């Protein structure tokens, strides 16, 4: 009988690992605490490394059709003055998209490869590094465990004791508004910066603003804030940025947290991937 691999978490790292293993005919199951696949919208940029992997998984073309391929990156100061421009082709293709688009195609590919996934399975205990106990009362036995369960990783808490996320002193804001710019724009200001980029061909533009402050809010990127709070935190930028903020239906904020560096991401039959291993 082949070894069974248990993947904890159905985010980007968990689904990507699942696709790779399923493509190689490995026996794996993904366990996800949510009751279904993530449909939370957030912008994400895909660099050449992940683009090559998506191509190997034969889903690159599908992702590209629902995404944007910016041609240049522009650095600006907080009033919009151009500091530097770089053509993306100088270092390879870059894709900007919505996180839920990437999740959808990774999940579809994983299922098509025969991969198994269990939703509503929140891991609450690991016994003998093999026995998985879930909140819903179910249990399962695996030979290897891959912790892909994010910065609040339950797997990591079993892997390393007394290791808690550490607040960096920065808060991030995100949202999806509208803009006709097809560029990646990076604005640099006092104690802060903002990154904006298109995520499809329908004028939808993702933005993320990072500002230094002492507000230790939850590290979850799904905590909703208000437009007024956002504009107050990033008041050093002009109306051209604030109008983008106001065009978003909702805005979200979260504290940026880090963890101590690990000398090894694997211990015994347990391996950490993604934010559970290296959140920053």
Task: Report each predicted region and the residues it spans.
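Residue-level marker for buried hydrophobic side chains located in beta-strands
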Residues: 28-30, 145, 266, 270-272
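FAD/FMN-dependent oxidoreductases across multiple families
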Residues: 200, 211-280
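Conserved N-terminal helical subregion
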Residues: 2-5, 20-22, 47-176, 214-231
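Glycine-rich FAD pyrophosphate-binding loop
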Residues: 22-41
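Conserved Rossmann-like nucleotide-cofactor binding loop
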Residues: 13, 36, 152
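Conserved N-terminal glycine-rich FAD pyrophosphate-binding loop of Rossmann-like flavoproteins
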Residues: 36-52
